[in-house]
Amino acid sequence: MSRVTAIISALIICIIVSLSWAVNHYRDNAIAYKVQRDKNARELKLANAAITDMQMRQRDVAALDAKYTKELADAKAENDALRDDVAAGRRRLHIKAVCQSVREATTASGVDNAASPRLADTAERDYFTLRERLITMQKQLEGTQKYINEQCR
């Protein structure tokens, strides 16, 4: 029986070694997968944080854009209303000007008849166009500065 006992003992030792090797192999795989899982979880967390940050920035930029777009539209509407009022005669466009006097031969000497200062129609249109463009540029510049100060720092 000692020979049978030796064979059985050898078989049991082989089975134990084989099972130990299998357990060690699967344990190493489990550790490797855990490391991969943890790494991917960290990367996912960072990606989600970046997405959240970008979404927040997009909302901020959209709100900023809406604010300055509204201000620009309001300024243009005010400029158009002013232009319409001047064209309809409800308001007058006052420009500091000096008129040259016109001397007439029939008037007494030393009395001047000055013509009232007035812009030519094209100059008036150009004034309002320039005013509108200045307002547009100012609002665009303010919006860009606000964007740079809030988003690029």
Swiss-Prot record:
<protein>
    <recommendedName>
        <fullName>Prophage Rz endopeptidase RzpD</fullName>
        <ecNumber>3.4.-.-</ecNumber>
    </recommendedName>
</protein>
<keyword id="KW-0081">Bacteriolytic enzyme</keyword>
<keyword id="KW-0378">Hydrolase</keyword>
<keyword id="KW-0645">Protease</keyword>
<dbReference type="GO" id="GO:0042742">
    <property type="term" value="P:defense response to bacterium"/>
</dbReference>
<dbReference type="GO" id="GO:0006508">
    <property type="term" value="P:proteolysis"/>
</dbReference>
<keyword id="KW-0929">Antimicrobial</keyword>
<comment type="function">
    <text>Necessary for host cell lysis. It is believed to code for an endopeptidase that cleaves the amino-carboxyl cross-link between the diaminopimelic acid and D-alanine residues in the murein component of the bacterial cell wall.</text>
</comment>
<dbReference type="InterPro" id="IPR004929">
    <property type="entry name" value="I-spanin"/>
</dbReference>
<dbReference type="GO" id="GO:0008233">
    <property type="term" value="F:peptidase activity"/>
</dbReference>
<dbReference type="GO" id="GO:0044659">
    <property type="term" value="P:viral release from host cell by cytolysis"/>
</dbReference>
<dbReference type="Pfam" id="PF03245">
    <property type="entry name" value="Phage_lysis"/>
</dbReference>
